[in-house]
């Protein structure tokens, strides 16, 4: 009996600090103090640096470093459960609002500035209402797509806890991919079979068409949207896939802590997408889930093709100037 009592007591210890834990909070057995700490750190603007230059001993029962204590919460499996993440429907609702804001700015606003990526991160550029009779060039559409995608990515929870350089790496690694995916899905919603800008123009500059084979043109303009058409991609699936792409822990040169934070948040959206597939497809849900994740590979191939297209500009310079943000993100 004594052994059983001792065993039960040890099983009711907080996974974070090893004090007595009364219940599961955010998915992990924890004490009230660690529960409240995790909630405050998630909802607030906690420190983004380790006070000991990442030399804290995380095996200590009590961590005075807030950042390392928060990282330990993530490592032990605490899940973010705020008003933003209460349920699958809430997750989708938040993503839909962010995407609607992004789309509204893309379609109805313009930016006269020529910022670098660092300038966009430090201080968001000023948008002004676009006259209804104003037509964008391909380079202007490209700039607005990248700019509004950076702003969209900045709204995600993980940006509060990443080092600034890690966030910059994420933007350089994923922004162009996400903007390309969004453009393909918008073209799909317009009943097109090739990727186009919002005004209906094809994405390949006319001055480069004579130097492209028909096979390459078909690949760069149709492969990604072809996969989307094949899947009959739904709006909710699209939103969750964007979130999964945003939280990419595989980008080169991320810190170990950055990878851990991104992996945690990506798993939240992976779980949400699987839950959606199971709800919509029943026993076929896991197969649908895998099919949707395969889009990531197609997006990567599309971006490689765009890279080849941009390389052609080395020999046939564009007739319009591309802004610095586009040059940085395309060069990533």
Swiss-Prot record:
Pfam families: Hormone_recep (PF00104), zf-C4 (PF00105). A zinc finger (NR C4-type) spans 14-34, 50-73. PROSITE patterns: NR_LBD, NUCLEAR_REC_DBD_1, NUCLEAR_REC_DBD_2. It comes from the Eukaryota. Residues 101-332 form the NR LBD domain. It is found in: Nucleus. Its main location: nucleus. InterPro entries: NHR-like_dom_sf, Nucl_hrmn_rcpt_lig-bd, Znf_hrmn_rcpt, Znf_NHR/GATA. GO terms for cellular component: nucleus. Keywords: DNA-binding, Metal-binding, Nucleus, Receptor, Transcription, Transcription regulation, Zinc, Zinc-finger. GO terms for molecular function: DNA-binding transcription factor activity; sequence-specific DNA binding; zinc ion binding. Residues 11-85 bind DNA. Orphan nuclear receptor. Belongs to the nuclear hormone receptor family. This is Nuclear hormone receptor family member nhr-9. It comes from Caenorhabditis elegans. The gene is nhr-9.
């Amino acid at each position: 009996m004594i052994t059983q009592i001792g065993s039960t007591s040890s099983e009711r210890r907080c996974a974070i600090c090893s004090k007595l834990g009364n219940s599961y909070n955010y998915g992990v057995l924890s004490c009230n103090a660690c529960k409240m700490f995790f909630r405050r750190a998630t909802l607030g603007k906690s420190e983004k640096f380790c006070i000991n230059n990442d030399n804290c001993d995380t095996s200590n029962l009590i961590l005075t470093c807030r950042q390392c204590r928060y990282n330990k919460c993530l490592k032990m499996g605490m899940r973010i459960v705020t008003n933003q993440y209460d349920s699958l429907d809430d997750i989708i609702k938040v993503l839909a609002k962010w995407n609607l804001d992004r789309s509204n700015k893309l379609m109805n606003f313009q930016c006269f500035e020529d910022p670098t990526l660092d300038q966009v991160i430090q201080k968001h550029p000023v948008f002004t209402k676009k006259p209804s009779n104003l037509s964008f060039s391909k380079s202007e559409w490209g700039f607005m797509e990248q700019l509004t995608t950076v702003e969209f990515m900045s709204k995600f929870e993980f940006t509060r806890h990443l080092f600034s350089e890690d966030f910059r790496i994420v933007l350089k690694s994923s922004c162009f991919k996400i903007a390309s995916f969004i453009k393909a899905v918008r073209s799909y919603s317009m009943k097109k079979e090739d990727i186009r800008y919002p005004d209906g123009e094809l994405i390949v500059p006319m001055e480069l068409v004579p130097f492209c084979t028909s096979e390459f043109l078909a690949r760069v303009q149709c492969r990604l949207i072809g996969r989307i058409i094949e899947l009959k991609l739904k709006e909710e699936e699209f939103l969750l896939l964007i979130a999964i792409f945003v939280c990419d822990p595989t980008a080169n040169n991320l810190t170990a802590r950055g990878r851990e934070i991104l992996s945690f948040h990506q798993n939240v959206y992976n779980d949400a997408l699987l839950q959606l597939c199971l709800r919509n497809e029943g026993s076929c849900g896991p197969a649908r889930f895998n099919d949707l994740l395969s889009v990531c590979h197609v997006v990567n191939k599309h971006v490689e093709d765009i890279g080849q297209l941009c390389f052609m500009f080395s020999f046939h310079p564009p007739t319009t100037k591309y802004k610095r943000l586009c040059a940085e993100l395309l060069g990533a």
